[in-house]
Amino acid sequence: MTNIHPTAIIEPGAKIGKNVVIEPYVVIKSTVTLCDDVVVKSYAYIDGYTTVGRGTTIWPSAMIGNKPQDLKYQGEKTYVTIGEKCEIREFAIITSSTFEGTTVSIGNNCLIMPWAHVAHNCVIGSHVVLSNHAQLAGHVVVEDYAIIGGMVGVHQFVRIGAHAMVGALSGVRRDIPPYTIGTGNPYQLGGINKVGLQRRQVPFETRLALIKVFKKVYRSEDSFSEALLEAQEEYGHIPEVQNFIHFCQNPSKRGIERGATKDAFQEESVDKEGALIES
């Protein structure tokens, strides 16, 4: 049963699904769609052509679907789509897109923490975490299972690969390859996200191959492109390695991040459970 508090403002035309809860002082504009089992907590504001997927919770004072912070926007019809079972926490801002017919999209099972900002034309995959005050500029792409730490700033048009983990307070100006971990401003890669991949039950052999490929590519005396081709020949049969190589071979206009710390090249050993540990 849908439960709408009498102080909430729901404009005529808004589409409200089954078992939706809308708390006091919420504002829902006329072109919004809330799917079944959505919860919108007090003072949240949802505008524009926004669709909120089933089971998602919008926390107090979040603002979704409002006019993009882009001077090029001239009132075109644009969209926001949020997937299922997401958590959009307090004071998060997800603006609408720029250019007719384009969409800001967020996948399923994402956690957007307080004060995070998702700008126009961003595309976020599923199972992504944006930590407190993470700021995504326009046209940023964040792939599945990536984690972006607190107070990170991401330059427009940057891509962040799947399963990457971006450390807090980082400034990200170039594409971050999938499966990597790093931090800093300027940003430096720290190698493969070994702990994250192990937690997600990526096979040991795959994790080890990714580590070897990262080292081959990032400390090779050959050119970056040549090192990628060599890695392709040796490890390209592994899907995750293929994904890493393809990502690096097809950068955005920002280019691939090339900086890496010395720790990224430490030798690896294996503990008795088969987990990778640093020597």
Swiss-Prot record:
It is found in: Cytoplasm. Its EC number is 2.3.1.129. It catalyses: a (3R)-hydroxyacyl-[ACP] + UDP-N-acetyl-alpha-D-glucosamine = a UDP-3-O-[(3R)-3-hydroxyacyl]-N-acetyl-alpha-D-glucosamine + holo-[ACP]. Gene3D superfamilies: Hexapeptide repeat proteins, Udp N-acetylglucosamine O-acyltransferase, C-terminal domain. It is an enzyme of class 2 (transferase). One of its GO terms (cellular component) is cytoplasm. SUPFAM superfamilies: Trimeric LpxA-like enzymes. Residues 258-279 are annotated as: Disordered. Pathway: Glycolipid biosynthesis; lipid IV(A) biosynthesis; lipid IV(A) from (3R)-3-hydroxytetradecanoyl-[acyl-carrier-protein] and UDP-N-acetyl-alpha-D-glucosamine: step 1/6. InterPro entries: Acetyltransf_C, Acetyltransf_C_sf, Hexapep, Hexapep_transf_CS, Lipid_A_LpxA, Trimer_LpxA-like_sf. GO terms for biological process: lipid A biosynthetic process. Keywords: Acyltransferase, Cytoplasm, Lipid A biosynthesis, Lipid biosynthesis, Lipid metabolism, Repeat, Transferase. GO terms for molecular function: acyl-[acyl-carrier-protein]-UDP-N-acetylglucosamine O-acyltransferase activity. The keyword Repeat applies. It comes from the Bacteria. PROSITE patterns: HEXAPEP_TRANSFERASES. Belongs to the transferase hexapeptide repeat family. LpxA subfamily. HAMAP family: LpxA (MF_00387). Homotrimer. Involved in the biosynthesis of lipid A, a phosphorylated glycolipid that anchors the lipopolysaccharide to the outer membrane of the cell. This is Acyl-[acyl-carrier-protein]--UDP-N-acetylglucosamine O-acyltransferase. The gene is lpxA.
